[in-house]
Amino acid sequence: MKPIQTVLVLGGDRRQQSLADALEAAGLAVRTFGLGEKSARAAADLEEAVARAQAVVLPLPCTKDETHIIGAAPQIPIDRLAALFLPEQLILGGMLTASVAARLQRGGCRVIDYYKCEEITVRNVVPTVQGILKQLFEQIDYTVFGSSACVCGYGRVGRATARTLNALGAQVTVCARSGAARASAETDGCASCDFQRLPEKAASFDYIINTVPAPVLGAQVLRILKPSCLILDVASAPYGTDFAAAERYGVRALQCASLPGKAAPKTAGEILAQGILHLWEEEGYV
């Protein structure tokens, strides 16, 4: 394989600008498209920019509607972009569905979902939790210290969030399906329950942070919440909250997407760049 020397960073949010900066600092020739940049590296023509790149880096997530690249201005249809790719190119995108990945590689190019890189997902927890705290602080008019919090799910993000809230003095209940996860939460100093018992406890919470990408906060729970309760749903699609039911019951429920790009885009972009460079090294592109 030829070493990658030319890269196109296309679409996304402020993370992609930081990603482009980090790849440039690593010695690569970087161009951008659709980021709203006013610099020498910003390409004016999409076709030319794609043709010159050995690798194209798409956003995280790559798309929301499976039709357009997220964040690109003007909008870029996925199928139009895919038609420009060459067989020898490497295409990288974040959170690719099987359908989108298949459409991107229809011309024979290689497609990699860089968000499957464990290094990136582990490091991405920190800016994600910072984003959760930022959202929470902007929405509440009381201190986290002494508040009653529920964290649904105890994966990487759920665990880091619960530990952080616990350290800030919140009374944290972790709701998780597995007994092992609940045991881990208890050893971390939190209370725990399973989802069957969540309706029994729901009325006591000041806010709920959901990290589970499956329906766990439905009408049975939402109708019991106190009027001031806040839900921050930070899970990926299809999310965990019945937002229509939340509206019916007058519950504030926010779908919080792309938190690292909002709370810490510089660090989040550097994390992506570092992970992508290591991925290229492992795959023989360096």
Map each language-model feature to its residues:
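Glycine/serine-rich phosphate-binding loop and adjoining beta1-alpha1 elements at the start
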Residues: 2-3, 58-145, 256, 275
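Residues at the starts of beta-strands that form the adenosine-phosphate
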Residues: 6, 29, 90, 148, ...
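Rossmann-like adenosine-cofactor binding region
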Residues: 61-65, 74-91, 187-261
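NAD(P)-binding Rossmann-fold cofactor-contacting core
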Residues: 26-40, 168-188
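Glycine-rich adenosine-cofactor-binding loop
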Residues: 8-18, 23, 145-165
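Residues in the short beta-alpha loop(s) of Rossmann-like NAD(P)-binding domains
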Residues: 13, 36, 97, 177-178, ...
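N-terminal glycine-/charge-rich "phosphate-binding" loop or analogous flexible N-terminal tail
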Residues: 5-47
